[in-house]
From Swiss-Prot:
This is Uncharacterized N-acetyltransferase R584. Its EC number is 2.3.1.-. The keyword Amino-acid biosynthesis does not apply. Residues 158-175 have a biased composition (Basic residues). It is an enzyme of class 2 (transferase). GO terms for cellular component: virion component. Keywords: Acyltransferase, Transferase, Virion. It is found in: Virion. Residues 176-196 have a biased composition (Low complexity). One of its GO terms (molecular function) is acyltransferase activity, transferring groups other than amino-acyl groups. Residues 145-231 are annotated as: Disordered. PROSITE patterns: GNAT. SUPFAM superfamilies: Acyl-CoA N-acyltransferases (Nat).
Length: 407
């Protein structure tokens, strides 16, 4: 038997239940099987004093079980990422609340915060949770005021209609009174349904939060899905960026190739963005066989890496290639993406890096022709729409969509 603690006056094996007030109530009357009727009785309110009861619980606290985040809402769709500035994070949360229930956004953010293991990032997300709590409080207060105003107007209209109905009912038959009652009930039900609809559609304007209306990075990651699907945060703990040029000479001709290397340590995993070469042929072939809707060989991969040297950048996780992007410069300020593929959880991260890299090279526009054929056609189109690309032309001859984005 466990020993009784100093602040527990009960004997070992028992705990003290706090005193409480029991509400009064009326016990219904009933008839016994013998035929005797027991009339109703009133049980008055009473105070139940503290008492010792058996401790049936196990010692210590139970395990903390958090619900799994679903796929109905991802904050990364609206540009939320913990490494973004506070203003951009708040703008993304407001945008998510404009298209979803603010309470759902708050719950999602709070759940991701509770999953967070790194104290620094958890502090950032805690600040955002407080921001969303204040946002939801304003939203709820404004909705309550609108509902009270709507109900008062509805009651005044209903009272005026009922008075006029009673004055007319003196000269009508019973059938007319019944039809009038049915009409009033329909009006009340319609007013209630309209009130519910207005509550669902009610949204809090952004300018109530003193946020500017321009721009905003929409390509940040959801803390659970940004880089890898099995990590619990998009925390950049270490950064190492190298930009260089490599000169290669052959048959008296020399060419200069760009080389890029950027590394991040995220949740113990080493995430690397770097220029690919022929040493990556096997890994590139594996991705091509998975995503390319045609046969691919190792010779073609090596030839493509050699021909387009310096224009193919990949993303690696612990030295495993998770995706790559092949691009070419088509003018002084335009760049075209010829091929882009990535495993689940790495596409947004790869594109975010590519856009940053293009900006560093003074490109102002990205062009891409998205194929409408193959098993991944819908996912491709949705992905580029989500990244902010606009459709300018549908090429029916080769079944491709021409999309562009200014950066």
């Amino acid at each position: 038997m466990p020993k009784s603690s100093s602040n527990n006056p009960c004997p070992p094996g028992e705990i003290l239940r706090e005193g409480y007030y029991r509400h009064g109530y009326e016990r219904r009357g009933f008839k016994r099987s013998s035929g005797t009727y027991i009339p109703p009785t009133e049980v008055s309110e009473a105070y139940v004093p503290p008492t010792c009861i058996i401790d049936r619980g196990k010692p210590g606290k139970g395990p903390r079980i958090l619900p799994k985040p679903g796929n109905d809402l991802h904050l990364s769709w609206y540009g939320y990422a913990v490494h973004e500035p506070e203003r951009d994070r708040h703008r993304a949360l407001v945008e998510a609340s404009q298209e979803n229930d603010p309470l759902e956004v708050l719950r999602r953010l709070n759940l991701l915060r509770n999953y967070q293991a790194y104290p620094d990032v958890k502090d950032i997300m805690s600040q955002d949770v407080k921001f969303m709590s204040d946002f939801y409080a304003k939203y709820k207060e404004r909705n309550q005021e609108a509902n009270r105003f709507g109900r008062s107007n509805s009651r005044s209209r209903s009272n005026s209609r009922s008075k006029s109905s009673r004055s007319r009912s003196n000269n009508r038959s019973k059938s007319s009174r019944s039809s009038s009652t049915q009409s009033k009930s329909n009006n009340r039900s319609n007013s209630r349904s309209n009130s519910k609809t207005s509550r669902r559609l009610k949204k809090l304007p952004e300018n109530d939060l003193d946020l500017d209306q321009d721009g905003g990075n929409r390509y940040g990651g959801d803390p659970l899905t940004s880089i890898t699907s099995d990590t619990t945060g998009n925390q950049i703990l270490e950064t190492n960026i190298k930009l260089s040029k490599e000169t290669e000479c052959s048959e008296g001709k020399c060419q200069v190739f760009n080389k890029v290397y950027e590394s991040h340590t995220i949740n113990g995993k080493k995430i690397v963005f770097e220029t690919l070469d022929q040493n990556d042929s096997e890994n590139v072939l594996s991705l091509d066989k998975l995503y390319l809707d045609s046969d691919q060989t190792i010779d073609r991969v090596r030839q493509n890496l050699s021909t387009n040297k310096g224009y193919i950048i990949g993303i690696k996780s612990d030295n495993k290639l998770e995706g790559y992007c092949w691009y070419k410069e088509i003018s002084n300020n335009e760049v075209k993406i010829f091929w882009f593929c990535a495993n689940k959880g790495y596409g947004t991260a790869l594109y975010t890096f590519m856009e940053k890299y293009f900006k560093l090279n003074n490109y102002s526009r990205i062009v891409i022709d998205v194929s409408m054929e193959g098993s991944y056609a819908v996912r491709r189109i949705n992905f580029w729409n989500h990244q902010g690309f606009k459709t300018y032309q549908v090429k029916t001859d080769n079944h491709k969509i021409h999309m562009e984005k200014d950066i």
